[in-house]
């Protein structure tokens, strides 16, 4: 739909892009919660908490809470864009290649350590995701890697193909091998704003997660994945019931959705102030700017302030309209869980393959998606983590490019962390890993002493 926006007025075209993207971020939580299939790649973590809540008969509560958290993150992000854009834009350029590499590495470390009791498995699946991300042309010399002489692998493995395979197609396989189940969808009971009232009980998690989303959105190349895993890990570490995470924790759901939806508006801070796109959405917005001869940067706030204000208003209105529509239509959306599981499995399978094929009109992509579907099916049956594969693919590519760029500019490993932000991130990584090692060692000692005493 991007080319269609070129014929529209700049603010109308940008509003259309923001509306489509924002709606997908909100709406992506719906299948993630109801049928364990993320609507977008960044809703993958929502399945961890949303699906178990649905299985407990709390689908309405999960959806309402997800909408509320998304609205909180979105509005908070827009408020930061409006109030703090001149100040916050100065921070983004301080993140060079070294800082972005360390931020991405921190994201990988946190997602691995957040899988309690499955740290080794999460580490292995993260490494597998990183390896998948290296298939194709390497980014500096453009030589082929791990293509095994197959030309169709030269373009790499598309992230969307992997996401649909690991989550949607694998879930379809699970539904097809199960006996038909009929669930009765509960009504919206409790009013349209029940989720907002419940969100007040998790206001600390919502506020911190939204802040993580804003901070990560401002850093070019980091985005939703790092933000949601930082938020999710924070919520888990500070929760009074960390054992509930992965089993339908409202706190985990709030953390994931608030962080996701705080990123897009925050990514516009470096775009508007410096002309630097922070992620895919702002890269598309930049093309709309150029088509209409709008030059983002400090001069934008002086020469076209009315355009900037209109963009702010559009962002706020979009958040209100999307969440209002979703809250009103929740009863209808809940009817999805009344569909017999085998029929639902076939529907997911068909829609997934149609979606994969439509990406590049490639039957090979469908075969790759099917392969990852089988892998996801096996991992789910073995109760092994899947999300680290996606994070490894996304952050692994960022880490490689930034590491290679950084190493060309430093003379020794010590120089890699000789800047303040890089040093702080490095220390945080050491503290996080050290704390986990210490915790694991103490747990081992206690277990050993109790077994000796017994």
Feature-to-residue mapping (PLM):
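Flexible loop linkers connecting adjacent transmembrane helices
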Residues: 34-62, 87, 96, 186-189, ...
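Membrane-interface alpha-helices at helix entry/exit sites of multi-pass transporters
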Residues: 11-15, 52-69, 239-252, 280-283, ...
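Transmembrane alpha-helix interface/packing and boundary motifs in multi-pass membrane proteins
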Residues: 1, 23-36, 111-116, 210-222, ...
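Helix-loop-helix hairpins and the membrane-proximal interhelical loops
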Residues: 1-11, 86, 93, 144-249, ...
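Re-entrant/interfacial helical elements at transmembrane boundaries that shape
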Residues: 1-4, 21, 32-52, 83, ...
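A structural-propensity feature for long, helix-poor, extended segments
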Residues: 17, 21-33, 249-274, 278, ...
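Membrane-embedded alpha-helical modules
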Residues: 64-180, 291-444
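Membrane-embedded alpha-helical segments of transport systems
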Residues: 22-27, 68-80, 88, 132, ...
């Amino acid at each position: 739909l991007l080319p269609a926006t070129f014929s529209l007025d700049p603010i109308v075209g940008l509003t259309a892009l923001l509306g489509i993207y924002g709606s997908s971020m909100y709406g992506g939580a719906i299948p993630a919660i109801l049928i364990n299939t993320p609507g977008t790649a960044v809703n993958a973590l929502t399945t961890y908490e949303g699906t178990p809540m649905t299985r407990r008969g709390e689908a309405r509560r999960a959806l309402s809470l997800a909408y509320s958290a998304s609205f909180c993150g979105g509005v908070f992000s827009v408020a930061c864009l409006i109030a703090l854009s001149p100040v916050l834009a100065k921070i983004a350029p301080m993140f060079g290649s070294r800082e972005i590499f360390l931020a991405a590495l921190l994201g990988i470390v946190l997602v691995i350590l957040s899988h309690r009791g499955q740290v080794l498995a999460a580490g292995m699946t993260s490494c597998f995701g990183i390896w998948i991300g290296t298939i194709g042309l390497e980014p500096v010399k453009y030589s082929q890697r791990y293509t095994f002489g197959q030309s169709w692998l030269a373009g790499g493995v598309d992230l969307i193909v992997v996401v649909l395979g690991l989550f949607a197609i694998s879930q379809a396989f699970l539904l097809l091998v199960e006996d038909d189940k009929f669930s009765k969808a509960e009504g919206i009971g409790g009013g349209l704003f029940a989720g907002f009232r419940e969100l007040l009980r998790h206001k600390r998690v919502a506020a911190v997660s939204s802040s993580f989303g804003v901070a990560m959105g401002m850093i070019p190349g980091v985005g939703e994945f790092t933000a949601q895993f930082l938020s999710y890990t924070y919520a888990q570490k500070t929760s009074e019931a960390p054992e509930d995470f992965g089993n339908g924790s409202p706190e985990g759901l709030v953390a994931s959705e608030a962080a996701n939806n705080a990123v897009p508006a925050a990514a516009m801070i470096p775009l508007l102030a410096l002309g630097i796109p922070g992620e895919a959405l702002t890269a598309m917005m930049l093309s709309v700017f150029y088509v209409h001869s709008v030059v983002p940067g400090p001069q934008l706030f002086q020469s076209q302030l009315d355009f900037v204000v209109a963009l702010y208003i559009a962002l706020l209105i979009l958040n209100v309209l999307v969440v209002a529509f979703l809250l009103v239509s929740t009863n209808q959306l809940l009817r999805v869980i009344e569909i017999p599981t085998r029929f639902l499995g076939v529907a997911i399978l068909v829609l997934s393959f149609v979606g994969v094929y439509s990406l590049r009109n490639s039957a090979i992509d469908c075969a790759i998606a099917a392969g990852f579907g089988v892998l996801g099916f096996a991992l789910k049956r073995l109760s092994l983590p899947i999300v680290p594969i996606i994070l490894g693919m996304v952050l692994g590519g960022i880490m490689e490019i930034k590491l290679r760029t950084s190493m060309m500019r430093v003379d020794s490993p010590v120089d890699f962390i000789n800047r303040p932000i890089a040093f702080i991130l490095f220390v945080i990584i050491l503290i996080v890993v050290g704390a986990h090692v210490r915790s694991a060692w103490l747990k081992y000692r206690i277990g050993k002493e109790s077994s000796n005493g017994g």
